[in-house]
Amino acid sequence: MDINNKARIHWACRRGMRELDISIMPFFEHEYDSLSDDEKRIFIRLLECDDPDLFNWLMNHGKPADAELEIMVRLIQTRNRERGPVAI
């Protein structure tokens, strides 16, 4: 997926679990543009993971084996915590 195709990335952010939508969509909407190109590529790789894995990682019930994905999960958690709750 092209890092500049925001419509497609936005669609990929929509998940089958509400809990994931609450974590991933605000991060994409508020933070994606400020990421480096490398971070954008890692975020897209994260979106290619299965929902159960994403849920476990974002809810701190495990962590990805891939160090880059782990850093992205922590970045999402940190930025969402700093921003506070947002309506989606």
Curated annotation (Swiss-Prot):
Major subcellular location class: cytoplasm
Gene Ontology CC annotations of this record: cytoplasm
GO biological process: succinate metabolic process
Keyword terms of this UniProt record: Chaperone, Cytoplasm
Entry's localization field: Cytoplasm
One Pfam short name: Sdh5
Superkingdom, natural source: Bacteria
Transmembrane segments: none
NCBIfam families: PRK10878.1
Role of this protein: An FAD assembly protein, which accelerates covalent attachment of the cofactor into other proteins. Plays an essential role in the assembly of succinate dehydrogenase (SDH, respiratory complex II), an enzyme complex that is a component of both the tricarboxylic acid cycle and the electron transport chain, and which couples the oxidation of succinate to fumarate with the reduction of ubiquinone (coenzyme Q) to ubiquinol. Required for flavinylation (covalent attachment of FAD) of the flavoprotein subunit SdhA of SDH and other flavinylated proteins as well.
Family named by the database record: Belongs to the SdhE FAD assembly factor family.
UniProt subunit comment: Monomer.
PANTHER family for the chain: FAD ASSEMBLY FACTOR SDHE
Protein name per UniProt: FAD assembly factor SdhE
Organism whose genome encodes this protein: Shigella flexneri
Gene name of the encoded protein: sdhE
